[in-house]
Curated annotation (Swiss-Prot):
The gene is Spint4. This is Kunitz-type protease inhibitor 4. One of its GO terms (molecular function) is serine-type endopeptidase inhibitor activity. Residues 41-91 form the BPTI/Kunitz inhibitor domain. The lineage of its organism: Eukaryota, Metazoa, Chordata, Craniata, Vertebrata. Induction: By androgens. Expression diminishes after 1-3 days and disappears 7 days postgonadectomy. It holds the Pfam family Kunitz_BPTI. Disulfide bonds join 41-91, 50-74, 66-87. Residues 1-24 form the signal peptide. Highly expressed in the epididymis, in the epithelial cells of the distal caput and early corpus. It is found in: Secreted. SUPFAM superfamilies: BPTI-like.
């Protein structure tokens, strides 16, 4: 390779390596100025311009729900979800801004959740590696005790 070509390629690679910080600043500014347009839920449905057939979901702002549409495979926008649950979680108000429970309900639900989690998986109660075996042993003993308490003791007669 000639020194001139090598110098040109070296200069080009140097220019490309220095460009990303400038472009990322421009990208951040664009994101700040256009944040409403980056929300896929605010975009209209875009079926695309190819000839494939894909069933997808989009968020309909008027109906306030996710609806099915035919996507042709290319040139769509971000308001295009493969699964309805993805569309719901991203766009539906229930998932975007979940209602906060009142004080009493919240205390009860947290207590019930904690009790349920502790009852179903004893191994989660101890996270220290050295004590994990002890926790598993306690679980085994507890399960054995429950099994034995369910059985009716058989009367044994020794003669």
């Amino acid at each position: 390779m000639k020194p001139t070509k090598l110098g040109f390629l070296l200069g080009l690679s140097l220019l490309c390596s220095l460009s990303p910080p400038v472009l990322s600043g421009v990208e951040r500014l664009a994101n700040y100025l256009c944040k409403d347009y980056n929300d896929p839920c605010l975009l209209d449905v875009e079926p695309g311009s190819c000839y494939e057939v894909h069933f997808r979901f989009f968020y309909n702002q008027t109906a306030k729900q996710c609806q099915i549409f035919l996507f042709t495979g290319c040139n769509g926008n971000l308001n295009n979800f493969k699964l309805k649950i993805d569309c719901d979680v991203t766009c539906h108000e229930t998932y975007k801004n979940p209602p906060l429970p009142s004080g009493d309900k919240r205390k009860r639900s947290l207590r019930a959740l904690a009790t349920k989690n502790l009852a179903t998986d004893w191994r989660l109660t101890t996270l220290q590696p050295g004590r994990l075996r002890q926790t598993e042993r306690k679980e085994t003993l507890l399960q054995r005790a429950r099994r034995e308490s369910r059985r009716q003791p058989l009367a044994r007669h020794h003669t």
